[in-house]
C-alpha cells in the first residue's frame, strides 16, 4: 500500500511538472520587470529583473491600443502587440495582448503562436475565423463572429481571421505568454533566409517549380 501511495505521488509530481513546463514559468516574487542589461539584475524567464528599488509605475503601463493603425497593404491588417518587449512589467506574468485592425476584406493570414493559446474578442465589425487541427485529420473549426463575440485558438495550431464585413473591423486578443511568438506560414515557407530549394517545395506542394519561385519573390525579405 505504501509502495502504491509513493508511486501515486511520483505520478502526480510528474504530471504537475510536465504541465508547468507547458507554459511560462510561474513567478516567485511580486514582479520581475524585464530589462535587457545585467546591471543590478537577475536573469529570469528570458529577461533580467530590474532592481525592485528602481521599478516605477511606468514599467507596468502601455498606451496606444485606442489608436487604429493603417492596414498593411499586403495583408489588409495591422497587429499592435503589447508584450514583454514594450511592457516590461509583463515579465514572468505569462500574459500578453494584441489589437488587430482589419481593413475592408483584410485578413490576419494563417499563422501559429508556438508558446501561447489565444482568446479573440471582436470589438468592431464581422470576422470569419478558424483554426486547423494537427495531422492526420487537419480538421477545420471555423465561425463567423460579430461584435461582442469571443473565440479561442489552441496553442500551436494554425489559425486565421478575415474581415468579411463592408467596413473596417477591430479585435483584441489575449495570449497565454508574455512573448507568444508568431510564425506566419506563407512568410516562413516562402520567405525563409536563405530560401528553401524551390524544387523541394514544388514537390511538397505538388506544384510547378515556377509557381514556387514566383511565390518566393513575393515573400522575400528586403
From Swiss-Prot:
Residues 63-213 form the Cupin type-1 domain. Transmembrane segments: none annotated. GO terms for cellular component: apoplast. It is found in: Secreted, Extracellular space, Apoplast. The keyword Aminoacyl-tRNA synthetase does not apply. CDD domains: cupin_OxOx. GO terms for molecular function: manganese ion binding. Glycans are attached at residue 78. Pfam families: Cupin_1. Mn(2+) binds at residues 111, 113, 118, 159. It comes from the Eukaryota. Keywords: Apoplast, Disulfide bond, Glycoprotein, Manganese, Metal-binding, Secreted, Signal. Gene3D superfamilies: Jelly Rolls (2.60.120.10). InterPro entries: Cupin_1, Germin, Germin_Mn-BS, RmlC-like_jellyroll, RmlC_Cupin_sf. Residues 1-22 form the signal peptide. PANTHER family: GERMIN-LIKE PROTEIN SUBFAMILY 3 MEMBER 3. Oligomer (believed to be a pentamer but probably hexamer). May play a role in plant defense. Probably has no oxalate oxidase activity even if the active site is conserved. This is Putative germin-like protein subfamily 1 member 9.
